[in-house]
Amino acid sequence: MGNNENGGISFCVFVVVIGFGTGAVAQEPANQSEAVTSLEEIVVTGGRSAQQISEIARTIYVVDSDQIQAEARSGKTLQQILGETIPSFDPASDGARTSFGQNLRGRPPLILVDGVSMNSARSLSRQFDAIDPFNIERVEVLSGATAIYGGNATGGIINIITKKGKDAEPGLHAEVTGGMGSGFAGSQDFDRNAAGAVTYNSENWDARLSIAGNRTGAFYDGSGTLLIPDITQTSTAFNERIDLMGSIGYQIDDDRRVEFSGQYFDSKQDSDYGLYYGPFFAALADPSLFETRSGYESDFNPQTRRSMLNVTYTDNDVFGQQLLLQGSYRTERIKFHPFPASGNSETGPYFYGSSQDTDYYGIRAALVAEPTDALKITYGIDADMDSFTARQNIFDMVAAGQSGGLDFNTIGKTGLYPSIDVSTVAGFAEASYEATDRLTLNGGVRYQFVNTEVSDFIGAAQQVAILQGRATSADTIPGGEVNYDAALFSAGATYQLTNTQQVYANFSQGFELPDPAKYYGIGNYSFSGGHYTLVNSVNVGDSALEAIKTNSFEIGYRLDDGTFNLETAAYYSLSDRSINLNRSSLAVEIIDRERRVYGIEGKAGVKLDHGFDVGVLGHWVRTEVKGADGWEKDSVGSASVSKLGGYVGWTNDALSLRFSGQHIFELTDAQNFTIDDYTLFDLTGGYRFENTDTTLNFGIHNVFDTDYTTVWGSRAKALYGGLADESVFDYKGRGRTFAVSLTKVF
């Protein structure tokens, strides 16, 4: 059981009280004309063309700029904001850099920034380590497998829309913000951030240039103990981040517009603290020797560095249709923490640091036609190429052993995974038809062709042995090419019960190509005379990686009358295969076992008298794989957790306050690994100085200083516990922290 059982019960009572309160003192419902505006005023672009929410037969949430900025300035990350706002999006793990296992409806989502995919051939889970919240205009979340985007959208789409000059007031304006945060647990428990932007908006031209920076200090848990360093996916403690972003748009005429945008993002950890393994790694045999110590030095540190260019062109009159064109380029380098490897009889144990590079090119073209007032058709093509390479820094084991794992100096570099090139070409079409004044039908089809090229590769451990001089040569594991194709379909219907209420149902398919880099390039070798002879291997010719197809179903209801809003849905998704991460080798394995995820999600809010508003959200989810004796619980390494959240807010012309909480329910899998339950509360607020156009934001996070293991920490114990004692991977969340910031608009 978790360590917050009483807190969970209290929190459930807190949410129930909110729920009953929402119906007790609500204002009178808005009039009918206001109600129509409430449902139809929000337009989302997460699909292939802009659509009103009222036309879409699926669950959609929009987190607007005001909420994102208020929460971020009060000390929350984007992952935390979305995890507390989107019912079916898993909770964030405070302090973690990774988003691994932070699923949407129990499956990985496709993350987009202005429509450009942040997902790659290598599933690195750094998609949110990509942008400062200062630069975000809104986030659109489309839940469930998405046929129209196809690959790697089995959980849905999270589309991050950045701020542009066209969204600003006319003329030249500027904005600056600065803030700090601390839990006051030690002299290095201090975070700070600053950002600034200049915007220009005229009749034809618009532009925005911004820079945002952040530096974090030490992280402490609820008991006041320095958090253990995350040697698996790394944390954001002792981290420096910079996000430089610019865009320029030109309105050619009433119908045509072109826009260019670019970004440079760098997030790097540089810590004086490391995981102490004991003298000459004695803690691997005696886990009691593991501890966090100062004096850590390494010439290789965790980092996410990304550059991105994006150009879009729209023409509202191409033979009576709207043309949408987009071209994008993204390059990134992702580095991890030095990590132990068992090696083989020649290399012995060694430490390596993983560095993985991706170059992504994408082109998207779509035409939007409206042959009749009732029919809208969007059709087009996509093409993209993803090139991936990986290498590993090998460290001096003498220096590392003498320091107990606190001193890592590179002695050479070798390959880590085979190089992977994934090329995709797809055609798609989707239609929306207003069958009656109240009934809208939706349907779509996508045909996708994927070519994967895998390079020849010498096993990673064998390359290390050659570097060490303990071997002279090795056979290569053969690469090759493999092609995939899939036809994906979607169909749905939305029925408007009243001008403020809708019911909808949807079927959609998703396509997923599991991580090829961690699947290929694994071989068994024999060793003789300094040469490694390949005995057998996982390669393209003998055991090509199989794709996974997912069918997703949902029914839902939404209501928004301007005072009360509610959205709820039940869903079921079934995939034909399962992905397993080998606990000893960390290799990806594809298993011919069906995997299903089903659940119910909901979110409700109401505006009350005297400036109060309250809301609740919840998600009940089950993830199962099919075994010989029927369905059984999936591993906590990837299965989603159920959650319940709520808030009470109050605002007047100047001051706003919000007290919120979230309870994470315990989850145990078939192997008895557990994600413990916990409950967290936050208090955030802001005060606006109208005369100076300045806003003061503040926040208290983890108000009751709860000591808990994050969801990622529980997952990491299940995933990596075969390599070292599970205590090494028990990543806890931060204790009580305070944050304050000041924002000035010119």
From Swiss-Prot:
Q: Which residues form the TBDR plug domain?
A: 52-163
Sorted alphabetically, the keyword list is: Cell outer membrane, Ion transport, Iron, Iron transport, Membrane, Plasmid, Receptor, Signal, TonB box, Transmembrane, Transmembrane beta strand, Transport
| Residues making up the signal peptide according to the UniProt record | 1-26
Tell me a GO cellular component.
Answer: cell outer membrane
The record places the motif (TonB box) at 40-47
Q: What does this protein do?
A: Receptor for the siderophore rhizobactin.
> Which family is this protein grouped under?
Belongs to the TonB-dependent receptor family.
* Protein name in UniProt: Rhizobactin receptor
- Which organism is this protein's natural source? Rhizobium meliloti (strain 1021) (Ensifer meliloti)
Tell me the classification of the organism that encodes this protein: Bacteria, Pseudomonadati, Pseudomonadota, Alphaproteobacteria, Hyphomicrobiales
Gene behind this protein: rhtA
